[in-house]
Amino acid sequence: MEKIRTLQGRVISNKMQKSAVVAIERFVKHIIYGKFIKRTTKLHIHDEKNECTVGDLIEIRESRPISKTKSWVLVRIIEKTVF
């Protein structure tokens, strides 16, 4: 059985119904210079209860394709943002 992939990221948009956009940051080493560069990947996630707000740190897991762009599901909110 395959291991289920989980990631952590920040919510950058939640204007859709039952969906959100999450920014996943990772560090990649430059091939020539060896410097570590921050790279960001944006993923669309499924948020069934519309729980997350912009700025929240969340955990997501990979799932079956839900729509054309969504194949990740919200697992839990790690850190809530207070405005």
UniProtKB/Swiss-Prot annotation:
Function: One of the primary rRNA binding proteins, it binds specifically to the 5'-end of 16S ribosomal RNA.
Family of the protein in this entry: Belongs to the universal ribosomal protein uS17 family.
Top-level taxon: Bacteria
NCBIfam families, per database record: PRK05610.1, uS17_bact
Protein name, UniProt field: Small ribosomal subunit protein uS17
Keyword set includes Thylakoid: no
InterPro entries the UniProt entry points to: NA-bd_OB-fold, Ribosomal_uS17, Ribosomal_uS17_bact/chlr, Ribosomal_uS17_CS
Keywords for the protein's UniProt record, in alphabetical order: Ribonucleoprotein, Ribosomal protein, RNA-binding, rRNA-binding
GO CC, alphabetical: cytosolic small ribosomal subunit
Pfam families xrefs: Ribosomal_S17 (PF00366)
Entry GO MF terms: rRNA binding; structural constituent of ribosome
Lineage, top ranks: Bacteria, Pseudomonadati, Pseudomonadota, Gammaproteobacteria, Enterobacterales
Oligomer and partners: Part of the 30S ribosomal subunit.
Single GO biological process annotation from the record: translation
